[in-house]
Amino acid sequence: MSSINYPFVTEKAMMLLDENKLQFIVDTRSNKKQIVEDVEKLYGFKVKSVRTMTTMKGTKKAILTFEDPESAHEIATRIGLM
């Protein structure tokens, strides 16, 4: 089972693409290591860092920074965000 639920798309999330970052809503029980493994397996790009937070609604959001400078744009194009 994948820990990634769906991409989190807001105006702020789209501005983070310029910083090579993407936001995803993830399973609340998943940890950073599981998130990195799932994203690398799904999209084939190396993750540099992960920041997670739990929202006031109880969902867990992950902000992923990628090593390759164009990875975030490539993934966003693949999943239809751009």
UniProtKB/Swiss-Prot annotation:
Q: Which GO terms describe its biological process?
A: translation
- Lineage, top-rank taxon, reads Archaea
Give the UniProt keywords, A-Z.
Ribonucleoprotein, Ribosomal protein, RNA-binding, rRNA-binding
**One function term, GO molecular function aspect:** rRNA binding
User: Which SUPFAM superfamilies does the annotation name?
Assistant: Ribosomal proteins S24e, L23 and L15e
> NCBIfam families, alphabetically?
PRK14548.1, uL23_arch
- Say which family it is in: Belongs to the universal ribosomal protein uL23 family.
Summary of the function given for this chain in its UniProt record:
Binds to 23S rRNA. One of the proteins that surrounds the polypeptide exit tunnel on the outside of the ribosome.
Question: What is the protein name given in its UniProt record?
Answer: Large ribosomal subunit protein uL23
Species assigned in the record: Methanosarcina barkeri (strain Fusaro / DSM 804)
